[in-house]
Amino acid sequence: MNLRPIILPAVGVAILVMLPMFLSANMLAASITMMIAALFALAFTLAMGQAGMLSFGHAAYYGLGAFAAIHIMVAVEKKLFFFPTPLIPIAGGAIGFVFGLVFGWFATQRTSVYFSMVTLALAELLYTLAPVWNTVFGAESGIQTERGPSWGFTFGPDFEVYYLTLAWFVLSAWCLWAFGRTPLGRLALALRDNEHRVRFLGFNTHLARTLIFAISCLFTGVAGALLAISKESGNYELFGPSNSANVVLQTFIGGAGTFFGPAFGAAVMTFFARVTSDLTRSWLLYQGLIFVLVMLFMPEGLGGIVSLHARRVKSGGWKVLVLPYLVCLVCGALLIAGIVFTVESLHTVLTDAYNAKRVAAKGAWVPYQLFGRSFEPLSPVTWTIPLALLALGGLLLRLATRLISRGWLLATGAAADDPNGRAAAHDRPQGATA
């Protein structure tokens, strides 16, 4: 019996349970946001990864779930009725499911890019109406509330919210995993691969796609409700296109072809955004570059790369991959350093603040501060640094791809099986060339 599918998730949950003991208050809040983003990505992957329905408007159900939770919390706060705080995500999921059925009924009448455009239009409709409907969405300022005590917990400290979020994340992840093994879950895969054949076999593909989409929206609503509980507020920006775009990018970066890949990608990119947004205004540019690089060199995503290595690399094969991957890391560090230096330098000299300094200096190019040092904008040395880093990184990249290709052949045993010494393209990392 293969225990890996049980042991690995159990170890992951155990780590998450013990994590708050080692985190600061700021990192604990970040961990809550990362788990919510991971659940959002898992819910989105049900529609996109399993059923092939690329939605550009999933933020609509994320926001609806959040506002459902907020209105219940407001009602509890006003003592209109009692509703246990740990069960509030059920309301978010219910609202997400209902609107997923209604909106999905219209959207799933079309496929491919037309489906994506319909979902985007419906989300933009809510995004436009939300600031106008003050009673429901609180206009531009949104609605603020407080978490109420339930079941002996106050849900005031962040660690209690962390464990509540963790419980819902684990439960929802298990439900999504189990759904993939139900007849409807198997039908979702068939719809993705060949919808015409499924229709020929007698299935009502429109109804099936609507149900699958609604279930995806259900768990998206749960994620939105958890966000509302953790933030104790919400505004119309929850429906914004940035939330819909983020979950798409995070899913592809994590790897839509694996189950936990999107969750991993969402957690990593949420943490990346939280850290870099405090350091630079160019963090969105870096996030976009990461997406482009992943699509170019790892189109299967981070989860796909891990899965590929777990399947293909033989026992002891990791030894021959250590050196190629170390060279690849050095190459990546050099390229990142060159790109960051260039971007931050350009961002600094093109700002209004720097332009004001030039005006004060009567048009002269004054030195600018970067990484604790002073640089002259017109000095050849200033621009030689990033160019040298990029050139050296580019040279090492060519060497790294060759080393990875050869190491991959040895690690997987393909060199012995193929007399030409070449591995099939689908059996090696995309960045490697034979």
List each language-model region with its residue ranges.
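Transmembrane alpha-helices and adjacent helix-loop boundaries
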Residues: 1-434
